[in-house]
């Protein structure tokens, strides 16, 4: 079996995001993911070091890195559409869950447990 996990992740740079507002510069999933991870990490560090509340910055950053990986199979859907009705939101969540599981199946068994939390 070929392990194509990282090849699929490399596709994120080809997935165009749906901006909620008119954007002067289009954004792809890879760019969005990097920005999200940096912000998540920074906010976690602020929580831990300024507000003195426990928060694992590295874990937050990794959650952000993998938060849109299902889109390598589904593409991006505009947020207003995704949440238009409760039923549509639930159905789309099922699709995203199946896409994430499909992606996990491209990993060797020894690595699946390490990636599953994300």
Where do the model's predicted regions map?
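Short linear capping/connector segments at secondary-structure termini
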Residues: 23, 81-84, 115-118
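Short alpha-helical hairpin
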Residues: 2-20
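Divalent-cation-assisted or electrostatically stabilized phosphate/pyrophosphate-binding catalytic cores
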Residues: 81-99
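Histidine/acidic-rich helix-loop-helix segments that form or flank divalent-metal centers
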Residues: 58-62, 105-118
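An active-site-proximal "capping" alpha-helix that borders the catalytic cofactor pocket
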Residues: 36-43, 96-105
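Aspartate-rich (DDxxD/NDxxD/DxxxD) Mg2+/diphosphate-binding motifs
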Residues: 53, 74-86
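Active-site alpha-helical segments that house and flank conserved acidic catalytic motifs
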Residues: 38-44, 58-77
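Alpha-helical phosphate/pyrophosphate-handling elements in metalloenzyme active cores
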Residues: 24-58
């Amino acid at each position: 079996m070929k392990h194509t996990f990282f090849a699929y992740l490399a596709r994120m740079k080809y997935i165009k995001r749906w901006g909620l507002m008119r954007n002067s510069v289009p954004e792809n999933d890879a760019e969005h993911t990097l920005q999200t991870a940096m912000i998540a990490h920074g906010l976690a560090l602020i929580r831990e070091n300024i507000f003195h509340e426990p928060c694992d910055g590295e874990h937050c950053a990794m959650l952000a890195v993998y938060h849109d990986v299902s889109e390598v199979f589904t593409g991006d859907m505009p947020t207003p559409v995704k949440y238009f009705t409760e039923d549509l939101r639930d159905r789309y969540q099922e699709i995203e869950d199946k896409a994430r599981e499909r992606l996990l199946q491209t990993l060797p068994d020894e690595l699946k447990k390490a990636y599953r939390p994300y």
